[in-house]
A protein has these predicted regions:
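Helix-to-coil boundary motifs at intracellular loop junctions of multi-pass secondary transporters
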Residues: 48-49, 79-80, 140-144
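MFS-fold secondary transporters
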Residues: 99-103, 107, 126
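Helix-loop boundary and gating motifs at the non-cytosolic
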Residues: 2-70, 74-77, 86-87, 93-101
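Membrane-interface helix caps of multi-pass small-molecule transporters
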Residues: 75-80, 152
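Interfacial helix-capping/hinge residues at the ends of transmembrane alpha-helices
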Residues: 42-43, 138, 151
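Loop-to-transmembrane helix entry/capping segments in MFS-fold secondary transporters
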Residues: 53-54, 145-153
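Hydrophobic core of transmembrane alpha-helices in multi-pass small-molecule transporters
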Residues: 28, 96, 111-133
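Intracellular juxtamembrane helix-capping segments at the cytosolic ends
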Residues: 130-145
Length: 153
């Protein structure tokens, strides 16, 4: 109990380390991109392309299913470093988001079924990279945020 109180008091007095404020912007932008890629807009777009209920279920299930790739990736994350794993994973992930941005622009070039197939491939790749890179997320954040201010952060 005394340790908890000491941490609580230290959390109210300790300033954030230099650079940690930038994480708030990262979290905000990450939240926005995830809302677009893994929430209502992608489902509405897939439905407009003629996606069946099965395809919609596949899209909904990709995110939790691809987290399974954390298991084999965990063996390599310590060797390459948490920051490298996260920054590389998030950068590659953004390439697939960029690909998704261009799919609606191909309306006259590709038929709706091909656009839907392209959306599925890009979402699969996005979620697989996200699943692999996310195994380094908590260790990296734990290393960035000192223990005495974690509750405040």
């Amino acid at each position: 109990m005394a340790h908890f109180l000491a941490l609580s008091q230290a959390a109210t007095k300790s300033p954030f380390p230099k650079g940690v404020q930038s994480l708030f912007w990262f979290f905000f932008l990450n939240f926005l991109s995830c809302q677009i890629i893994m929430d209502s807009p992608i489902f509405l777009y897939a439905e407009s392309l003629g996606a069946s209920a099965t395809i919609m279920g596949l899209i909904a299930g990709m995110t939790p299913l691809m987290v399974i790739f954390q298991i084999p990736a965990a063996a390599h994350v310590g060797r390459w470093g948490y920051k490298f794993f996260i920054s590389t994973g998030w950068t590659v992930r953004l390439l697939f988001v960029l690909g998704l941005v261009f799919v609606p622009l191909m309306d006259g070039v590709l038929n709706p079924q091909s656009q839907l197939a392209l959306v599925l491939v890009l979402l699969f790749a996005f979620n697989m990279v996200r699943g692999i890179a996310s195994c380094a997320w908590f260790p990296w954040i734990r290393g960035l945020i000192p223990e005495n201010i974690r509750g405040r952060y």
